Amino acid sequence: MSMTPREIVSELDAHIIGQNEAKRAVAIALRNRWRRMQLPEDLRQEVTPKNILMIGPTGVGKTEIARRLAKLANAPFIKVEATKFTEVGYVGKEVDSIIKDLTDVAVKLVKSQAVEKNRMRAQDAAEDRILDVLLPPAKDQWGNVQESDNSSTRQVFRKKLREGQLDDKEIEIDVAAQVSVEIMTPPGMEEMTSQLQSLFEGMSPNKTKKRKMKIKDALKVMVDEEAAKLVNPEELKQQAIEAVEQHGIVFIDEIDKICKKGEYSGGDVSREGVQRDLLPIIEGSTVNTKHGMVKTDHILFICSGAFQVARPSDLLPELQGRLPIRVELKSLTKEDFERILTEPNASLTLQYRELMKTEGVEIEFTKDGISKIAESAFRVNEKTENIGARRLHTVLERLMDGISFDASERSGEKIVIDEKYVQDALNDVVENEDLSRFIL
């Protein structure tokens, strides 16, 4: 069963501060995928996903929500930049490649799930192959394997193998030889490249080559080989296509960068042309991929953009209509910065503490020190460009510069980063607008 909206928001809260409206929107959209699958077949086809447009300044968590969502979804997920595409007929990536790449992701996902499902059987088969190398079965004069009475010896070796007692012993095994075919093609023809590679690799016979390696490494290689044998490629493709059609999620970032600006009337192959090409895919069409035909009717699209120069109304009206749910992400405050520095599971202050601990240096961030760091980042954002939480990275790097450089010579020391320490390290740069513009 899929996670509930409350559980999804709770997971996102562990990594992203604030932006509850955006978290709720993506949580509901994810849960609706599960709800739809519980409906009768005829009604299920009629329920289409409500695509989302996330609007907010840079550095407030739009892309981070996408990254974390990919891990939670357990479904085919791809994140693309809208600026990477050009209109059909021009040099560059076409919009159709989004669905082709999503299908490739789905094939890998379904394959890894199938391999995991068969791992126990594959493990047994791999152990048998290694035991055959360690205890070769006796053969008669015609080369046929004879029934041997070494089953008890075999069980002893199997026990040792499972306990790791034979891990460092070297053996020579036959492994599948990977045929690598490198093909150079002009930009925008990646699809043809992959098809030619598949063709040439399929023409080559299944060869094996002998390799010498430690038993623990050989076991991993053989488990993967045996698991791959237990998987039906055609069945995998069908499952992958179904996973894309029913559960696929596409996150399109920088959608504001393909808005038409001003009264420019010429052809615009990487802006309005891309919007026109996106329309049928988001609305629902069929895309031909190397794995088969994929319908996009029920793929969920989440678009995001800063919209600092353009506005959502600058998008094509038809595209606006296909993104019915609008979510606005708020600019971050000083209090948000303080929470970002301390609350997430892998907060910035924790990262620096652990990094310095590897050199034997103990770092302690006091409450007033964290408050001062947050205030400095907030002030620089106000005085120069507002780049959101990314400003914390530059401020902290500047603050920790001296410690990072000298840490290897200060093993055993404890350094307390309080308000005075931050004031002394950053005051000149924060107060001087010219310096903060170029350094922070």
Curated annotation (Swiss-Prot):
Classification via CDD domains: RecA-like_HslU (cd19498)
Annotated InterPro entries: AAA+_ATPase, ATP-dep_Clp_protease_ClpX, ATPase_AAA_core, Clp_ATPase_C, HslU, P-loop_NTPase
GO molecular function, one term: ATP hydrolysis activity
GO process annotations (BP): protein unfolding; proteolysis involved in protein catabolic process
Entry's Gene Ontology cellular component terms: HslUV protease complex
A matching Pfam family: AAA
Subcellular location: Cytoplasm
Positions annotated to bind ATP: I17, G59, V60, G61, K62, T63, E64, D253, E318, R390
SMART domains: AAA, ClpB_D2-small
The entry's keywords: ATP-binding, Chaperone, Cytoplasm, Nucleotide-binding
Gene3D superfamilies: 1.10.8.60, DNA helicase RuvA subunit, C-terminal domain, P-loop containing nucleotide triphosphate hydrolases
Thylakoid among keywords: no
Record bears the keyword Ubl conjugation: no
Known partners and oligomeric status: A double ring-shaped homohexamer of HslV is capped on each side by a ring-shaped HslU homohexamer. The assembly of the HslU/HslV complex is dependent on binding of ATP.
Family classification: Belongs to the ClpX chaperone family. HslU subfamily.
Cited NCBIfam families: hslU, PRK05201.1
Role, per record: ATPase subunit of a proteasome-like degradation complex; this subunit has chaperone activity. The binding of ATP and its subsequent hydrolysis by HslU are essential for unfolding of protein substrates subsequently hydrolyzed by HslV. HslU recognizes the N-terminal part of its protein substrates and unfolds these before they are guided to HslV for hydrolysis.
Protein name as it appears in the record: ATP-dependent protease ATPase subunit HslU
Species: Actinobacillus pleuropneumoniae serotype 3 (strain JL03)
